[in-house]
Regions:
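Extreme N-terminal tail/first-helix region
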Residues: 2-34
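Soluble catalytic domains of membrane acyltransferases
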Residues: 14, 31-142
């Protein structure tokens, strides 16, 4: 049984990236022992959905998340620390996969950036880790 499949999401949420990238995402997840369960039903087609990803406690979360996005071939927008995007090749790849750099040092910056991005979307998903950090926290940032 594959770790993830494009059949888990409706066609309207697919990014139609190269099959080699989809295969790479599935292979990374499978190799690391991860599997994506569930999916998104067709009734959500054309709607704006927010996917909450928690807990975010490791740098591996980003690697696994991008692998899942690739394996699903999902059109998912996700928020990431702006410093990750400053490296040319990594930044370009992260943007290609749906990443949006946000500067967490600006007061209210991440919230306004997320609101601005959600308003621009039409029938896509946004994934965010509400803790705002990889450290273990007792409650989410609001």
């Amino acid at each position: 049984m594959p770790s993830v499949s494009t059949n888990q999401i409706p066609k309207g949420f697919r990014a139609y990236r190269p099959r080699a990238l989809q295969w790479l995402g599935r292979t990374v997840l499978s190799f690391l022992g991860w599997k994506v369960n569930g999916g998104i039903s067709d009734e959500h087609q054309g709607k704006k959905l927010v996917v909450v990803l928690a807990p975010h406690t490791s740098n591996w979360d980003g690697i696994l998340g991008v692998a899942a996005i690739a394996g699903l071939d999902a059109k998912i927008t996700f928020i990431g620390k702006h410093t990750v995007f400053k490296y040319f090749a990594l930044g370009a790849f992260m943007r290609y996969m749906g990443g949006i750099p946000v500067d967490r040092t600006k007061p209210g910056g991440i919230i306004q950036d997320a609101i601005d991005q959600i308003r621009k979307m039409n029938g896509t998903l946004i994934g965010m880790a509400p803790e705002g950090t990889r450290s273990k926290v007792k409650e989410w940032k609001t």
